[in-house]
């Protein structure tokens, strides 16, 4: 690496190192909060710019936002159903955009140039705490969707089509957030580690196509998470006959 000293900040690996903030008796990962709010701020800025002067014939940022709106609307309508999909569009859209921006922000923004006392900045979704929190939000959401639409009839789902399904569906309630959180966390963390190792070993050639592949898989992971969240909500509000 002597010939490429400028690449050293990108090639350092600090797995499991965190910048801790103390809030009372609670320790939180400071770098996750920092990158999350920076990316949320960038996303909000994009929305403000795109909606500041709305035009009948959209172009630029407005055109991008309208494309995203149509895409999220179609996704929610397909997975949740015509009856209640509008109520859940903001939630599904927020999940998709936050995960998408977090994944791409981790891949495209040179966070490692910003030095911290401990740990390093990176994609919020490469931290298991973030993905578990998102998965638990999805679980709470489909419970709420089922109970608010059906009342206590929601629990008929656990014995449909036969009471034999009860233990399996109870276990499923635990496996859903586990699979959501670990799938997203594992894919994003693995992508960051692979790119960092390749930058260290082969700094100029090989990492570039791997980074493009990482951008593609990051977008797919955001889509999978949002689609599964919408599907679980749709499953909760579906009427069983």
Swiss-Prot record:
What is the protein name given in its UniProt record? ATP synthase subunit a
Alphabetized, the UniProt keywords read: ATP synthesis, CF(0), Hydrogen ion transport, Ion transport, Membrane, Thylakoid, Transmembrane, Transmembrane helix, Transport
Q: Which species? A: Prochlorococcus marinus (strain MIT 9211)
Location in the cell reads:
Cellular thylakoid membrane
Q: Which residues form a coiled coil?
A: none
In terms of InterPro entries, this protein maps to: ATP_syn_F0_a_bact/chloroplast, ATP_synth_F0_asu, ATP_synth_F0_asu_AS, F0_ATP_A_sf
Lineage start: Bacteria, Bacillati, Cyanobacteriota, Cyanophyceae, Synechococcales
Question: Family assignment?
Answer: Belongs to the ATPase A chain family.
How this chain assembles, per its entry, is:
F-type ATPases have 2 components, CF(1) - the catalytic core - and CF(0) - the membrane proton channel. CF(1) has five subunits: alpha(3), beta(3), gamma(1), delta(1), epsilon(1). CF(0) has four main subunits: a, b, b' and c.
Function, as annotated: Key component of the proton channel; it plays a direct role in the translocation of protons across the membrane.
Q: Name one GO molecular function term.
A: proton-transporting ATP synthase activity, rotational mechanism
What CDD domains does the record tag this protein with?
A: ATP-synt_Fo_a_6
Q: Which PROSITE patterns match?
A: ATPASE_A
Task: Look up and give the membrane topology term.
Answer: Multi-pass membrane protein
């Amino acid at each position: 690496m002597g010939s490429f000293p400028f690449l050293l900040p990108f090639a350092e690996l600090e797995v499991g190192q965190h910048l801790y903030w103390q809030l009372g008796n609670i320790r939180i990962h400071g770098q996750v909060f920092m990158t999350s709010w920076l990316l949320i701020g960038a996303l909000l800025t994009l929305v403000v710019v795109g909606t500041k002067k709305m035009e009948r014939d959209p172009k630029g940022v407005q055109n991008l936002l309208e494309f995203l709106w149509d895409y999220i609307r179609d996704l929610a309508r397909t997975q949740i159903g015509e009856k209640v999909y509008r109520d859940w569009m903001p939630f599904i859209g927020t999940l998709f955009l936050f995960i998408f921006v977090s994944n791409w922000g981790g891949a495209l923004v040179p966070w490692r140039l910003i030095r911290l006392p401990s740990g390093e900045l990176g994609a919020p979704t490469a931290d298991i705490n973030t993905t578990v929190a998102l998965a638990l939000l999805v679980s709470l959401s489909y419970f709420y969707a089922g109970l608010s639409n059906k009342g206590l009839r929601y629990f008929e789902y656990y014995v449909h089509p036969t009471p034999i399904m009860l233990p399996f569906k109870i276990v499923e309630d635990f496996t859903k957030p586990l699979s959501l959180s670990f799938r997203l966390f594992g894919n994003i963390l693995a992508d960051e580690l692979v790119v960092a190792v390749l930058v260290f070993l082969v700094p100029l050639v090989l990492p570039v196509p791997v980074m493009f592949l990482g951008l593609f898989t990051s977008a797919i992971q955001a889509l999978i998470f949002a689609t599964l969240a919408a599907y679980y909500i749709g499953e909760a509000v579906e009427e069983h006959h």
